[in-house]
Regions:
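Hydrophobic transmembrane alpha-helices and their immediate loop junctions
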Residues: 1-221
Length: 221
């Protein structure tokens, strides 16, 4: 996101979109966890859409430097069904993807702008969008929502998708050690930050594989 400082309007649009996307993801995931039996999450204040409760500091750093961040992870309830596990892991990310597609559709219907077959996260890396202020806001926010939503579904701690991987995995010693190293010792965070800072092309390639087809579907591009 810092690369957009040369264009203050685009930077502010990206910043606002990222704050809203991360807050929405964390809030939705928290509400789903509470309804799945987590009685402690209400005590953390995460059942309110408060950015201070939902934006992960490392995720904010990833967003500032690499353009894509993540929200504070939600702990899994001790007693949970597979349905609850799947809902907690996927609902927030899928909600962001849905919002992103609706924003792209609104942009397409209002201005007949499409992605033109281009890689969608190129917009995120460039930090700019053409057209009027409203069109730029729709384009940048849609890409932020789509990218953040897809990133959250990847099975790497602290991302929500990892809850599904480790929640359904056998409780063998190997899996438990992997979970401990990636989550408790923050190697998962380190891997994400390294990709954001040193090899952003790899992270964007992963996101593009999912985001660009969705954008083309929404806009007919």
């Amino acid at each position: 996101m810092l690369y957009a400082l040369r264009d203050p309007v685009s930077f502010l649009l990206l910043l606002a979109s990222t704050v809203v996307a991360l807050t929405l993801h964390g809030w939705i995931t928290s509400v789903v966890a509470a309804r799945s039996g987590d009685r402690q999450i209400a005590l953390t204040g995460r059942l309110r859409p408060d950015p201070r409760r939902h934006i992960d500091p490392y995720g904010a750093l990833g967003a500032l430097v690499g353009g894509i961040g993540w929200s504070v992870p939600v702990a899994l309830p001790a007693r949970r069904s597979k349905g609850a596990l799947i809902a907690i892991a996927l609902t927030g990310g899928l909600a962001l993807v849905g919002v992103g597609m609706l924003l792209l559709l609104a942009l397409h219907l209002s201005s007949q702008v499409s992605t033109g077959g281009a890689r969608v996260t190129a917009v995120l890396r460039a930090g700019t969008g053409g057209g009027s202020l409203g069109q730029r806001a729709l384009l940048l926010s849609s890409v932020v929502f789509l990218s953040t939503g897809i990133l959250s579904l990847l099975p790497l701690p602290p991302l929500a998708g990892s809850r599904l991987l480790f929640g359904l995995a056998p409780r063998s010693g190997g899996w438990q050690r992997a979970e401990y190293q990636l989550e408790e010792r923050n190697f998962g965070v380190l891997a994400l930050l390294v990709m954001s800072l040193l090899v952003p092309g790899l992270l964007y390639a992963i996101i593009d594989a999912f985001v660009t087809p969705l954008a083309r579907l929404a806009t007919g591009g």
